């Protein structure tokens, strides 16, 4: 009986030498900031649809989204504490990401080059500019992805549409190109 117990103990010891530890990678924490989304659309349903794109891009990144409310609060506090008046720099975005304990930060904004004010022959404002979406690795401080969409002499709806376009293209790029985050 003791020989059997010793043999079993020996087998268990030998088997334990050949087992592999499996390391499970956790999903990266992703913060998403969409600057000017409320200004670029008047339709609440469109705004909600645009916000749903945030979760889709995080899903494409195989990440875990930091709640929008928490991200917005940290960004607002950062703006007030650091007296940011125009837009975030890369350093600002990285600092916000660190405050949120994020691995990546996704940032989109429409950058205005020119505004044509309403006048005698047209009654709506027209915009020229670029909607840019960037994904920044907070730890390495590097851009991992960047895409833009031009708006030339477009209305407010065109600015909103450009936001949808950059999100849709980004989601497709991440999935099709197999970008790793």
Question: Which ranges hold each PLM region?
Answer:
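Extracytoplasmic/secreted cell-surface and envelope-processing proteins
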Residues: 40-42, 114-120
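C-terminal/domain-edge helix-coil "capping" segments
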Residues: 25-31, 51-56, 96-100, 115, ...
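Sec/Tat signal peptide C-region and signal peptidase I cleavage site
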Residues: 19-25
């Amino acid at each position: 009986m003791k020989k059997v117990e010793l043999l079993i103990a020996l087998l268990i010891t030998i088997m334990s030498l050949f087992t592999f530890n499996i390391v499970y990678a956790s999903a990266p924490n992703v913060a998403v900031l969409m600057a000017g989304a409320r200004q670029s659309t008047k339709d609440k349903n469109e705004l909600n649809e645009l916000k749903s794109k945030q979760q889709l891009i995080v899903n494409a990144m195989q990440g875990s989204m930091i709640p929008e409310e928490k991200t917005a609060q940290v960004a607002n506090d950062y703006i007030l504490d650091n007296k940011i008046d125009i837009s975030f720099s890369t350093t600002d975005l990285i600092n916000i990401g660190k405050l949120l304990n994020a691995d990546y930060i996704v940032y989109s904004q429409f950058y205005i080059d020119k505004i044509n004010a309403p006048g005698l022959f047209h009654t709506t404002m027209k915009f020229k500019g670029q909607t840019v979406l960037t994904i920044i690795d907070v730890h390495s401080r590097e851009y991992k992805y960047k895409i833009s969409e031009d708006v030339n002499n477009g209305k407010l709806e065109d600015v909103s549409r450009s936001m949808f376009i950059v999100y849709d293209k980004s989601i497709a790029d991440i999935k099709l190109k197999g970008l790793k985050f």
